[in-house]
Protein backbone atom coordinates (compact mmCIF):
# COMPACT_ATOMS: atom_id res chain seq x y z
CA UNK A 1 0.00 0.00 0.00
CA UNK A 2 1.23 3.47 -0.87
CA UNK A 3 -0.34 6.58 0.53
CA UNK A 4 0.32 10.30 0.52
CA UNK A 5 1.39 11.68 3.91
CA UNK A 6 -0.91 14.50 4.98
CA UNK A 7 1.20 17.17 6.68
CA UNK A 8 -1.75 18.93 8.32
CA UNK A 9 -4.14 16.11 9.30
CA UNK A 10 -7.49 16.41 11.01
CA UNK A 11 -6.99 15.69 14.70
CA UNK A 12 -9.20 15.14 17.73
CA UNK A 13 -7.81 16.87 20.80
CA UNK A 14 -4.51 17.21 18.91
CA UNK A 15 -4.20 13.47 18.19
CA UNK A 16 -4.02 11.92 14.72
CA UNK A 17 -6.56 9.23 13.97
CA UNK A 18 -7.64 6.96 11.17
CA UNK A 19 -10.81 5.10 10.33
CA UNK A 20 -11.03 1.32 10.07
CA UNK A 21 -13.93 0.68 7.70
CA UNK A 22 -15.20 -2.85 7.08
CA UNK A 23 -16.24 -3.68 3.52
CA UNK A 24 -17.47 -6.95 2.01
CA UNK A 25 -17.50 -7.58 -1.73
CA UNK A 26 -19.91 -10.46 -2.26
CA UNK A 27 -20.01 -10.38 -6.04
CA UNK A 28 -17.98 -8.94 -8.90
CA UNK A 29 -20.47 -9.43 -11.72
CA UNK A 30 -22.69 -7.75 -10.83
CA UNK A 31 -20.57 -5.72 -8.43
CA UNK A 32 -22.08 -5.98 -4.94
CA UNK A 33 -20.45 -4.09 -2.08
CA UNK A 34 -21.55 -3.88 1.56
CA UNK A 35 -20.12 -1.27 3.91
CA UNK A 36 -20.61 -1.95 7.60
CA UNK A 37 -22.01 1.12 9.38
CA UNK A 38 -19.86 0.58 12.48
CA UNK A 39 -16.09 0.70 12.36
CA UNK A 40 -13.14 1.76 14.47
CA UNK A 41 -11.44 5.09 15.00
CA UNK A 42 -7.81 4.41 15.90
CA UNK A 43 -5.65 7.06 17.55
CA UNK A 44 -2.00 7.96 17.81
CA UNK A 45 -1.11 8.43 21.47
CA UNK A 46 1.03 11.59 21.44
CA UNK A 47 0.07 15.09 20.28
CA UNK A 48 0.58 15.61 16.57
CA UNK A 49 3.66 17.52 15.42
CA UNK A 50 4.75 17.77 11.79
CA UNK A 51 7.70 15.47 11.12
CA UNK A 52 11.12 17.07 10.90
CA UNK A 53 13.08 16.24 7.77
CA UNK A 54 16.37 15.57 9.57
CA UNK A 55 15.03 13.51 12.46
CA UNK A 56 13.28 10.20 12.96
CA UNK A 57 9.52 10.56 13.43
CA UNK A 58 8.01 9.49 16.75
CA UNK A 59 5.75 6.52 15.94
CA UNK A 60 3.39 7.41 18.80
CA UNK A 61 2.74 10.78 17.12
CA UNK A 62 2.33 9.64 13.52
CA UNK A 63 1.09 6.05 13.57
CA UNK A 64 -2.36 4.89 14.66
CA UNK A 65 -1.63 1.16 14.79
CA UNK A 66 -2.95 -0.34 18.02
CA UNK A 67 -0.09 -2.85 18.08
CA UNK A 68 2.38 0.05 18.33
CA UNK A 69 0.46 2.48 20.54
CA UNK A 70 -0.53 -0.04 23.21
CA UNK A 71 3.13 0.07 24.34
CA UNK A 72 3.22 3.85 24.88
CA UNK A 73 3.66 4.51 28.60
CA UNK A 74 2.89 8.20 28.03
CA UNK A 75 -0.45 7.61 26.32
CA UNK A 76 -2.45 10.86 26.26
CA UNK A 77 -5.89 9.49 25.45
CA UNK A 78 -8.46 7.87 27.69
CA UNK A 79 -11.82 9.23 26.65
CA UNK A 80 -13.65 12.29 25.43
CA UNK A 81 -16.10 14.51 27.25
CA UNK A 82 -18.36 14.77 24.20
CA UNK A 83 -18.74 11.03 23.60
CA UNK A 84 -19.96 8.50 26.14
CA UNK A 85 -18.41 5.52 24.37
CA UNK A 86 -15.06 7.16 23.58
CA UNK A 87 -12.58 5.23 25.64
CA UNK A 88 -8.94 4.50 25.03
CA UNK A 89 -7.05 4.53 21.75
CA UNK A 90 -9.82 2.79 19.77
CA UNK A 91 -13.29 4.31 19.54
CA UNK A 92 -16.47 3.07 17.92
CA UNK A 93 -17.93 5.06 15.04
CA UNK A 94 -20.81 5.86 17.38
CA UNK A 95 -18.43 7.70 19.74
CA UNK A 96 -16.70 9.43 16.82
CA UNK A 97 -20.03 10.60 15.41
CA UNK A 98 -20.97 12.08 18.80
CA UNK A 99 -17.82 14.19 18.72
CA UNK A 100 -18.48 15.22 15.10
CA UNK A 101 -22.02 16.31 15.99
CA UNK A 102 -20.71 18.27 18.99
CA UNK A 103 -18.55 20.20 16.50
CA UNK A 104 -21.54 20.78 14.15
CA UNK A 105 -20.27 18.31 11.53
CA UNK A 106 -23.00 16.52 9.58
CA UNK A 107 -21.87 12.93 10.19
CA UNK A 108 -24.39 11.47 7.73
CA UNK A 109 -23.13 13.68 4.90
CA UNK A 110 -19.51 12.89 5.80
CA UNK A 111 -20.14 9.13 5.93
CA UNK A 112 -21.92 9.35 2.57
CA UNK A 113 -18.76 10.88 1.10
CA UNK A 114 -16.64 8.18 2.75
CA UNK A 115 -18.87 5.47 1.23
CA UNK A 116 -18.49 7.12 -2.17
CA UNK A 117 -14.68 6.99 -1.85
CA UNK A 118 -14.81 3.32 -0.82
CA UNK A 119 -16.99 2.40 -3.81
CA UNK A 120 -14.80 4.36 -6.25
CA UNK A 121 -11.69 2.71 -4.82
CA UNK A 122 -13.16 -0.75 -5.36
CA UNK A 123 -14.31 0.16 -8.88
CA UNK A 124 -10.75 1.30 -9.67
CA UNK A 125 -9.53 -2.19 -8.69
CA UNK A 126 -12.29 -4.00 -10.58
CA UNK A 127 -10.14 -5.10 -13.56
CA UNK A 128 -7.68 -6.85 -11.21
CA UNK A 129 -10.53 -8.29 -9.16
CA UNK A 130 -12.17 -9.63 -12.33
CA UNK A 131 -8.97 -11.44 -13.32
CA UNK A 132 -8.61 -13.00 -9.87
CA UNK A 133 -12.27 -14.04 -9.83
CA UNK A 134 -11.97 -15.70 -13.23
CA UNK A 135 -9.07 -17.80 -11.93
CA UNK A 136 -10.13 -18.60 -8.36
CA UNK A 137 -13.87 -18.15 -7.79
CA UNK A 138 -16.10 -20.89 -9.24
CA UNK A 139 -19.32 -18.81 -9.25
CA UNK A 140 -18.74 -15.24 -10.45
CA UNK A 141 -22.03 -14.00 -9.08
CA UNK A 142 -21.32 -15.08 -5.52
CA UNK A 143 -17.99 -14.97 -3.66
CA UNK A 144 -19.15 -17.01 -0.69
Q: Which positions does each model-derived feature cover?
A:
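Catalytic core of tubulin tyrosine ligase-like
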Residues: 1-144
Amino acid sequence: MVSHYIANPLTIDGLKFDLRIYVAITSINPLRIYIYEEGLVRFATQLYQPPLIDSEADPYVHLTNYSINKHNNKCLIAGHEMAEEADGIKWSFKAWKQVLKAHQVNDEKLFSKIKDIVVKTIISCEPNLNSAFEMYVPHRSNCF
